[in-house]
């Protein structure tokens, strides 16, 4: 199960990113968080932007509402989805874990 927290009315969870993949997608669970494949290379913040875009599409919100709180230069990232409660996020992320 995905470990979700709530911070100021926004869902927060951990993501393990795998850059330079053949396509961008959510793969499933990884140590209480989500594992994602990202097509972009980790250069010039491209993989971080793609990670935010991936979750914005998944939650059907603008990319500006998805933030990486920590791990900008790491494969393990803490992601916040602004304006989405942890309960609502759990429903969206349920198919992945």
Swiss-Prot record:
GO terms for cellular component: cytoplasm. Coiled coil: none annotated. InterPro entries: DUF167, YggU-like_sf. Pfam families: DUF167. It comes from the Bacteria. Belongs to the UPF0235 family. PANTHER family: UPF0235 PROTEIN C15ORF40 (PTHR13420:SF7). This is UPF0235 protein Ppha_2415. The lineage of its organism: Bacteria, Pseudomonadati, Chlorobiota, Chlorobiia, Chlorobiales.
């Amino acid at each position: 199960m995905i470990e979700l927290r709530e911070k100021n009315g926004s869902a927060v969870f951990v993501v393990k990113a795998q850059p330079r993949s053949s396509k961008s997608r959510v793969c499933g669970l990884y140590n209480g968080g989500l594992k994602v494949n990202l097509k972009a290379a980790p250069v010039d913040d491209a993989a971080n932007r793609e990670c935010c875009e991936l979750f914005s599409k998944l939650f059907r919100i603008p990319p500006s509402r998805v933030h990486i709180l920590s791990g900008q230069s790491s494969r393990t990232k803490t992601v916040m989805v602004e304006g989405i409660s942890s309960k609502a996020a759990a429903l969206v992320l349920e198919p992945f874990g």
